[in-house]
């Protein structure tokens, strides 16, 4: 399994951290982006960012030797064609359906016939992405949480056509990364799978409380932390998920 090569398409807040996590778990990983600046930023974050190897070494989370080995397994590329030669390709581009559909169309043309195509979408239909390919049995959702280096969350989204082999492979990779994979069904008529549907219901109600003058957003955050032992409140979650908890 660790001889498997994995490609990550998109070097943003999520893509860079996911690539770092996969390389740390022992996989040869290529992080791809059309922007050289995005690739440089991602590499800098992997090396010296808040969740990067330098700080992880300082905190005793990883040895210098293991961090060096992970960096040796991690590469950055502007070539989607090169990245698509991997055994698994995980799409992590911005949450725009038109962009994700285009990426899956391009991956279908570039990837080998046995390559599993996964998406880190927060809620778009995996069936719609699979429809851009000739391999719907090898298309699957793998939704990560921010920051991906830390969070154990792994929402594995399957369609009626996703093969058991693809599901098992992604589950095994997720577990080897220290994640807790939970398989859920694609719901093409709704956005958000499980985690985000429940999350946004909470956010809507929290915003109603503020709009009605019942409490401030700061007080809502603190009450939820105190009552439910959350690390942060709902409004703080929005900011953290957006900026990668930097």
Regions found by a protein language model. Name each.
Residues 73-77, 226-231:
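A short structural micro-motif
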Residues 34-37, 41, 52-117, 124:
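Rossmann-like NAD(P)-binding element
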Residues 25-27, 135, 156-187, 202-230:
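Internal alpha-helical scaffold of NAD(P)-dependent oxidoreductase catalytic cores
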Residues 34-48, 52-67, 156-166, 192-199:
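Rossmann-like dinucleotide-binding cores of NAD(P)H-dependent redox enzymes
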Residues 116-186, 193-196:
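Rossmann-fold dinucleotide-binding core
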Residues 1-55, 110:
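NAD(P)+-binding Rossmann beta1-loop-alpha1 motif at the extreme N-terminus of oxidoreductases
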């Amino acid at each position: 399994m660790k001889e498997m090569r994995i490609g990550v398409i998109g070097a943003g807040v999520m893509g860079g951290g996911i690539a770092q996590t996969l390389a740390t778990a022992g996989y040869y990983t290529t992080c791809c982006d059309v922007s050289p600046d995005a690739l440089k930023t991602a590499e800098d974050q992997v090396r010296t960012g808040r969740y990067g190897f330098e700080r992880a070494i300082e905190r005793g989370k990883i040895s210098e030797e293991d961090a060096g080995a992970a960096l040796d397994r991690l590469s950055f590329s502007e070539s989607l064609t090169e990245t698509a030669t991997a055994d698994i390709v995980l799409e992590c581009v911005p949450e725009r359906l038109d962009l994700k559909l285009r990426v899956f169309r391009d991956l279908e043309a570039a990837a080998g016939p046995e390559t599993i195509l996964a998406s880190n979408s927060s809620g778009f239909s995996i069936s719609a992405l699979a429809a851009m390919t000739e391999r719907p049995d090898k298309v699957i959702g793998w939704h990560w949480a921010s920051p991906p280096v830390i969070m154990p969350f792994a929402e594995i989204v399957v369609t009626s056509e996703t093969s058991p082999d693809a599901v098992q492979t992604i589950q095994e990779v997720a577990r080897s990364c220290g994640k807790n994979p939970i398989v859920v069904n694609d719901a093409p008529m709704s956005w958000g799978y499980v985690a985000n549907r429940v999350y946004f219901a909470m956010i809507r109600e929290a915003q109603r409380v503020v709009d009605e003058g019942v409490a401030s957003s700061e007080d809502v955050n603190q009450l939820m932390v105190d009552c439910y032992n959350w690390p942060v409140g709902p409004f703080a979650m929005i900011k953290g998920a957006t900026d990668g908890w930097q």
